[in-house]
Amino acid sequence: MSSQSLYKVSGNIAANALVNNDQYKKMYQESIVNPEGFWREHGKRIDWIKPYTKIKKTTFDDHNLSINWFYDGTLNASANCLDRHLAEHSDRVAIIWEGDNASEQRQITYGELHTQVCKFANALRSQGVRRGDIVTIYMPMVPEAAVAMLACARIGAVHSVVFGGFSPDSIASRVIDGKSKVVITADEGMRGGRAIPLKRNIDDALKHPDVTSVEKVIVLKRTGGKVDWVEGRDVWWHSLVETASEHCAIEEMGAEDPLFLLYTSGSTGNPKGVLHTTGGYMVYASMTHEYVFDYKPGEIYWCTADVGWITGHSYMVYGPLANGATVLIHEGIPNYPSPARLGEMIDRHKVNILYTAPTLIRALMAEGKQHFDKYDGSSLRIMGSVGEPINPEAWRWYHEVIGHEHCPIVDTWWQTETGGILITPLPGATDTKPGSATRPFFGVQPALVDNMGNILEGATEGNLVLLDSWPGQMRTVYGDHERFVLTYFKTFRGMYFTGDGARRDEDGYYWITGRVDDVINVSGHRLGTAEVESALVSHELVAEAAVVGYPHDIKGQGIYAYVTLTRGTEESEELRQELRQWVRKEIGALATPDLIQWATGLPKTRSGKIMRRFLRKIAANEVTNLGDASTLADPAVIETLIETRLNRNE
């Protein structure tokens, strides 16, 4: 491995970090050889009402699947995020909030957050919410979203947070599946200068004929925008909490009692309700937050994810608050009203740790580094990446422009299903390579297998599986355990199949190559789309690229690239040929794109994930039945791509 592509841990960071390389190796070895002993000790990091004596009862046998952690202990997640900090840190700031408009700012201490959660938990009880009931939360990025989650956890209700950009149909499908009794929303949300009609979307969703379970809709007044009102069903948040008591006893929950549902897209298109339980999840979310981000008390931590995604659950609410952290929550998007916003917020709030997504980094790259001319960034210590593999070019830009070449980058790989980070560098322990998620976290046993399920040793490439359970793992698909077993444990017997492919290099570092269905087979050779995308984006005129396979008469599959150019760059046939040669030079002739379509934008979900199933269909000229596009941030992008597609059979 060339020295340019290896970023060594600095002596200063290693000396002050929670874990150095020798400690990582020792702790990791213990976590694999003696998981019972390791987790018996580390489970104590959270507070238990009845301490556990039983640690782990797990098997990945698809005929006898069992995932149980700390399973005779009892606890409460809300108490772990709030009550346990009150004696010593009641006045510490828990949440710093900045609105879409930077003039709107709030600070909430742990004591104040505790009071708000208790009052709202009592309000929920007054509306008939009881232990085990499912409550749907469809909220903007305001502190009350976290209040609602923690209030549910306090009284043993199961929250199901739906991302505030989802359509009424998407909301309805989740409400129906979970049979929610109560929905919590706001009149409107603000995002990028636009008002999002949250209450109207809820009203439309609840008109669906199969929605029969909802009794109450609690509405937060965020903007004061006009809303329709259903008497007897709708109730204002403020009117409920005005009269509610500030004292709310916690519900004692079993470690394996459900904490939340979070719906994620399945390959079939039907959302699946990922169920996470309380004990193992809280241990794992808090432990990964502390060790992966080398978190020190008093630091300001900013995760840019929306609360509607797992990253928002684990690394904006439960993990950081369990650790007594100060969390920055931003209502809007970090490149509005200008790309300078991210840097301005880091400086304004003296952010020490930043956790964001490659899609934002690439968007800022495309705008140009001049937007960071006035950015100081001296407060920043650790930076993270999450959501998809980060291409080396974006990694280096992030490191140089945002981190001023002194902040370690933790490129984290995990999933909604895993509850927390599984493969990641640790800042004081791991030399990093741009584009690699590097090594497994404690207790995590990744392996690569071929398509027959045979384990591959050494430097190789294959399907990424996990050989044993970890505490943060999902327990089932809500209401469909068979689907859980089928999706994750039937493909490779005795293993959890992640659905991702990966490469392991000569140093044992893992490189995520993309979903296994994002692998192109060109003339019998497997190519990860992420690899071709990385090569394209490393060209200075390319802002973003998405690569898919399409039917090819000779090769079986050809390579079809959608390319977004940097602002001000002219599209031309010459540039198209230049990019083909560029990829050929970067990877090899085999990886040369057959077709390159210019794209002003790519179809993305509101969390920034590129929806490649649309791109695959357009590339294959199958444009008559593309399926539901309601989850896209901008469905109009699809029409443009169809009109300018290259593979027409006309």
Swiss-Prot record:
It comes from the Bacteria. GO terms for biological process: acetyl-CoA biosynthetic process from acetate. GO terms for cellular component: cytosol. ATP binds at residues 387-389, 411-416, 500, 515, 526. Its cofactor is Mg(2+). PROSITE patterns: AMP_BINDING. Acetylated. Deacetylation by the SIR2-homolog deacetylase activates the enzyme. It is an enzyme of class 6 (ligase). Mg(2+) binds at residues 537, 539, 542. SUPFAM superfamilies: Acetyl-CoA synthetase-like (SSF56801). The keyword Protease does not apply. It catalyses: acetate + ATP + CoA = acetyl-CoA + AMP + diphosphate. Its EC number is 6.2.1.1. The modification N6-acetyllysine is found at residue 609. Pfam families: ACAS_N (PF16177), AMP-binding (PF00501), AMP-binding_C (PF13193). CoA binds at residues 191-194, 311, 335, 523, 584. PANTHER family: ACETYL-COENZYME A SYNTHETASE. Catalyzes the conversion of acetate into acetyl-CoA (AcCoA), an essential intermediate at the junction of anabolic and catabolic pathways. AcsA undergoes a two-step reaction. In the first half reaction, AcsA combines acetate with ATP to form acetyl-adenylate (AcAMP) intermediate. In the second half reaction, it can then transfer the acetyl group from AcAMP to the sulfhydryl group of CoA, forming the product AcCoA. Belongs to the ATP-dependent AMP-binding enzyme family. This is Acetyl-coenzyme A synthetase. It comes from Shewanella sp. (strain ANA-3). The gene is acsA.
